[in-house]
Amino acid sequence: IKGFRFDVINVISKPKFYENDYEGDGRRFYTDGRNVHKYLKELVAAGGIDGMITVGEMSSTTLENCIGYTAEGNHELTMCFNFHHLKVDYKDGQKWELMEPDYLAMKKLFQTWQEGMQAHGGWNALFWCNHDQPRAVSRFGSDTTYWKESAEMLAVAIHFMRGTPYIYQGEELGMTNPHFT
């Protein structure tokens, strides 16, 4: 399979000048910028990757933007990684302050993205883990008593959705966090 994974590709279009951001952390200036679709089309055309599988990691983007990136006629990306479902255990929206996952919110996010991408011709890259995330069995399941059942449930959940599943190394074995500390 020939293809490329583009890390945080939706932040390649930035303004020439930044103003003070009193409304947040500055993402509105550099996420899904004005020229990002133009740049992606140029990259596909000039990079010799038309017809290859391309997946883009999307930082803080919307469903509508992912549809735009992946709709078949747009010639930008084959599919998108979005991280909204992995933020359901962020306490007060902070990545390093965790709480019990809100499974109902996760279910609603999956439903919204599944229905939205299908209705508008987009395509999801489905995943639980990557190099920036803890192991899904430890995070969203039980890594002790119900380790096997948790691993199977998470695998079935991802593989029965519409999209292309990605399996992070060790995930096929139901790998858990090492709990060093």
Located regions from the model:
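Active-site and adjacent substrate-binding regions of carbohydrate-active enzymes
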Residues: I1-T181
